[in-house]
């Protein structure tokens, strides 16, 4: 796990022996389950350390020291897949509450298994779509941090994510490649859903060679009750425009 250890140090993170052991076990279980569940195309030991584990931990750069120390810090990972970035963030922030949301039951089975194997507490695995789950009182506007590595465009992600975020919280979207046009197109959705663009942070880590960004959006007022719209609508008719 040396690549992960070195990269994490550049983020200001010094992983403990326990955390390193958890990441090793995570890797072993990921590769083992991937043979039948098709969780990821990345299985090389070095690449998992950087492209999955380290990449997930970069979300920490979007958080303040005060936020990291909050005893009631809560995270929801939308479309988490094999648990990225949610589980690596939970390993780093063991005191946090984490919800892992994915629409696929097979992935949820793996997630529940890995949560138990890593002995992570205060973690809930939820099977469902963001469009529906965000309207449930238990989840709506109830999280400090909303994260997603999903490949959907930013206007779509904003509609799905911001309703989960409480006032004063953040949505952090992890993006690769050109993001400028996406951000322009998402400006209306950000405003409509109660957000405000905080910053777009380019990641400068040699371990992550391709262009990666954190798009950080603050939640400043409540999302209108009608959002997100019913399943599939945000994808078919995203809120696109400039405010």
Task: Set out the residue ranges of the language-model regions.
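Short loop/edge segments at beta-strand edges and connector loops
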Residues: 17, 127-129, 201
